[in-house]
Amino acid sequence: MKHEKQQRFSIRKYAVGAASVLIGFAFQAQTVAADGVTPTTTENQPTIHTVSDSPQSSENRTEETPKAVLQPEAPKTVETETPATDKVASLPKTEEKPQEEVSSTPSDKAEVVTPTSAEKETANKKAEEASPKKEEAKEVDSKESNTDKTDKDKPAKKDEAKAEADKPATEAGKERAATVNEKLAKKKIVSIDAGRKYFSPEQLKEIIDKAKHYGYTDLHLLVGNDGLRFMLDDMSITANGKTYASDDVKRAIEKGTNDYYNDPNGNHLTESQMTDLINYAKDKGIGLIPTVNSPGHMDAILNAMKELGIQNPNFSYFGKKSARTVDLDNEQAVAFTKALIDKYAAYFAKKTEIFNIGLDEYANDATDAKGWSVLQADKYYPNEGYPVKGYEKFIAYANDLARIVKSHGLKPMAFNDGIYYNSDTSFGSFDKDIIVSMWTGGWGGYDVASSKLLAEKGHQILNTNDAWYYVLGRNADGQGWYNLDQGLNGIKNTPITSVPKTEGADIPIIGGMVAAWADTPSARYSPSRLFKLMRHFANANAEYFAADYESAEQALNEVPKDLNRYTAESVTAVKEAEKAIRSLDSNLSRAQQDTIDQAIAKLQETVNNLTLTPEAQKEEEAKREVEKLAKNKVISIDAGRKYFTLNQLKRIVDKASELGYSDVHLLLGNDGLRFLLDDMTITANGKTYASDDVKKAIIEGTKAYYDDPNGTALTQAEVTELIEYAKSKDIGLIPAINSPGHMDAMLVAMEKLGIKNPQAHFDKVSKTTMDLKNEEAMNFVKALIGKYMDFFAGKTKIFNFGTDEYANDATSAQGWYYLKWYQLYGKFAEYANTLAAMAKERGLQPMAFNDGFYYEDKDDVQFDKDVLISYWSKGWWGYNLASPQYLASKGYKFLNTNGDWYYILGQKPEDGGGFLKKAIENTGKTPFNQLASTKYPEVDLPTVGSMLSIWADRPSAEYKEEEIFELMTAFADHNKDYFRANYNALREELAKIPTNLEGYSKESLEALDAAKTALNYNLNRNKQAELDTLVANLKAALQGLKPAVTHSGSLDENEVAANVETRPELITRTEEIPFEVIKKENPNLPAGQENIITAGVKGERTHYISVLTENGKTTETVLDSQVTKEVINQVVEVGAPVTHKGDESGLAPTTEVKPRLDIQEEEIPFTTVTCENPLLLKGKTQVITKGVNGHRSNFYSVSTSADGKEVKTLVNSVVAQEAVTQIVEVGTMVTHVGDENGQAAIAEEKPKLEIPSQPAPSTAPAEESKVLPQDPAPVVTEKKLPETGTHDSAGLVVAGLMSTLAAYGLTKRKED
């Protein structure tokens, strides 16, 4: 074979001038025949099914002009299009006859059919046959003979008017109805490339739901297309005289698919999943059309065949092997493929109607998109090395597959490009029963048969015009061929009836198919973009799509079932509106959707106007009261930054219970990590980190963040006790371990455990946030959080995994923007979804803060919909978080964590937002259900409750219990209808009821029973008095319990009195423990003035008393006494200034010896971090940041004891200056031969991200022209929300910013 002969053949093509190209695109119509325009190829213009193939030329544009009658094709080279008027004049006049009036819409014109004599013969032949498919074809032909003709046959306007006037009104109405029904009967299909890319059953069901909603009839599912992503339970294949075992075939196909693309979301659908999917679609009235493509697009099957021992199954063209196409000369490979198709067809038999066998793009990857020409070449260039009788073998192969499919009662379908390629019918005939999915009219050098020829050959046509194509990931103009904008424009300009390459004829179609392809299977699937494509296609062809009746059905279902609760007048209006919906025409199209929508709106209006009867009104109010009480009322405590003792947390639980809260949200991991399990062994990265090592590392990490003098971490025993204690008070506990931000302690711990560089690094190294590219760090953190989830599983209901404020300290609060810029946002979504899945696997409800979810209201990635969103902020300038409305549209529910209610310990008004007074004010101003950035009730989104938050951004700030209780009380008092009344007294009384009620009088038991029955457990704080009355009644009934009378009268002389067992009763009695008042003199206060330093709180002692009643005499015995509430002594400062020297006798007063204050300075040693520098000579080091020791001031009270010794007591410890970490670079560059690698290391250059002062564009530029992001740095406002992760000591920078803002009269809110 000579190379030049290959070249001679490969360049065989025709072209027309540039003017024709421009005209073709301008008119958006097909202007040339098969030997048409050769477009300029660009690298971003792949084919329909394959990235590497050539794009469509102008000849692919479909026709919207009037069409000629189907005639035998006359020889021609180039067909040009003239204006419509000229074309009408030049059309053949073989069938002119008076015509009835036709619609002038493009869709109606396209529906016109003019059969040829060949078609009539086909119709007559089909009329004699009995198969349902052929009956359908007969009906089509009949329709062709009686429906509207082309524009050339229209009579003049006056003749049209006369003809219309002569027709009876009923006849005209029937014809219009028949036209509507014909259009609605067409198939409207959405195609999903589930062969290249894995789609989960849930995703496919969502697509089916949308298809139903928009009026589609079918889902076309390519399960075999390059990849093979559907596996039967039994995959045993018998071919070539042997049987390939099922498990062997499964393993081979799974490997073959993974070799094509190893999709992280899954490999394939199972048989049970497919069966469920088909049934689900059937219930929705949607058919399913499966595709297993061959002989091309078989990458996975070819790889599988090689795994199973079939040699050389791939087609080869002059030494270049096709990765996707089977060699039709390889009998073993062909036999195996046919057996496989037979296996799948047998499964789909009686489940579906149509089976697509593919047949497109033969070996385009090995022949430069000349596969069909190569197969036909031997006939015209014999003995030159082309496949002998290649095209004849392809026809035989296609017909064999059609026969296999039909043997299972299915209709075969195939793509058009290989059928009668180059309009050459001399090689043989294709089975006429193959439905042709007409997707392309070809392009320069890709000369497919016209749809006219295919129709003449008796094939039904499914219009799959590639003008409507969308390739996943190509979401806008400039992102490659078949991008979404291109598809939407194609839909706008190309109606469903515009078939590719008609050559001027009207082509009857069975329907239209819009397609989404996965040429790049790693590209993200965006449901909203697919649904946009589907919606536009339905709207553009509204007359063909059924109207949405589901919304009407839903509106009917939402009518209250019990209408007896409403007034007769309002019920009558509802019934009339219901009747109007039920009487709607059942064959309305999407174009008539307004008729349905108006009826629905009327029904909804009448339902909203239903008026309750007085009795029902009371019931409804009671129901609403219960619904409000069912909302979560949560108090959040930042126990990750600051250490809280078990006793402090119990007292918070007590107060929460008293006020009617439902839960305590405990951030145990938030910058610091202040909860350690007994066993902290972590297995990750192929190794096990010992428990003691992990504990030590976490403690050191937490202390490095803040060494709290009150303690470092809660133990497992303490947290277990806290959970049980809260449970006894009807309080739930919601744990939070925050990541990948707010991980200061964990990051230090990982480094100490040998995990290098776990921190994110942008403008600088983040102290708070993990690097999502560091797989070792990610694996460790997931294992650690999984450990905590294991502990809380079964003990709590919700687990918060955080995910807020990514690397705000290293990006000027632009972390999410940076993630998107560096294309790491998908990694974040994957990480968040993994944590959500881990929580669900353990029976926990996953929760997260809202920051990172769908940043900027964009669905660039997909997040787990089951996550409960703790919504605290819409963001601020430059921090564009998703709106609550957008998240609600994604199906999320919220725990309202409105930042208006935030209090940061120690915060003062001059510090910014988050101070106590403002938080207390906002509990009265911001409604319970009002989410940040919205107004309630105008915006009423689905919330499960609300959360009040206490933050410890400055962990050294003093915790004052009374402040927290004041804020908790204010929140409860301003939302009394949501907060449960104080049931503590009721719990105590219920605990007093004897477990054994035998021996008490019937009357007293009945009174007790009545008191218990009257109890209402759904009273809110507005009805505390009602509850107190119920408790008093129960208490009185308990006190009224009396022993039953066992006999009456006197005993007989022989009668023995019955033995009555007298049992003691256990009661509890509480007494108050008064607090002491401790007075301390303060020389700085005026004489006689007092100042309460610590408010006194009375304690409580509970006595457990045994009460024994015998012969009417009651004896009480105290069994035990316990202090159940500790006393807090009141500390009061009393003014006692010294105003003079000497008293009236001239003597100086004797002063009380008071303790003195001793301040001692302590040095805090700096830590050293070592980083490798590939640009520095090996063995050399250089200090990048010089370490500076910090200073801690310790305040001691020094007093003298009675024996004269000094007693020193630590009063407080304050870090006066933080230590500065020393960063040292160690060189790794080798400059000589003979090192371990034999050459010098090559330094990796990383882009430095800088944020200039000017605003950044709203969307990032294309990759090839990428510049550094220019988002503005955030400014600071007076409403400073908690720094949930930023400790920035750059005082000069802050001062400079504030000075600049002061010049504009601005202040900035910094919400962390």
Curated annotation (Swiss-Prot):
Q: Which GO terms describe its biological process?
A: carbohydrate metabolic process
Its domain of life?
Bacteria
Domain (G5) ranges: 1059-1138, 1150-1230
Q: What does the record give as EC number?
A: 3.2.1.52
GO MF entries: beta-N-acetylhexosaminidase activity
Cellular compartment(s): Secreted, Cell wall
**Proregion positions:** 1285-1312
Pentaglycyl murein peptidoglycan amidated threonine is found on 1284
The reaction(s) this protein catalyses: Hydrolysis of terminal non-reducing N-acetyl-D-hexosamine residues in N-acetyl-beta-D-hexosaminides
User: Polar residues compositional bias: what residue ranges?
Assistant: 38-59
Its GO CC terms are: extracellular region
- Which residue ranges does the record annotate as region Catalytic domain 2? 621-1046
Q: Does the keyword Secreted apply?
A: yes
Q: Where is this motif: LPXTG sorting signal?
A: 1281-1285
Q: Where is this region: Catalytic domain 1?
A: 176-616
Alphabetized UniProt keyword annotations? Cell wall, Glycosidase, Hydrolase, Peptidoglycan-anchor, Repeat, Secreted, Signal
What is the protein name stated in its UniProt record?
A: Beta-N-acetylhexosaminidase
What organism does the UniProt record list as the source? Answer: Streptococcus pneumoniae serotype 4 (strain ATCC BAA-334 / TIGR4)
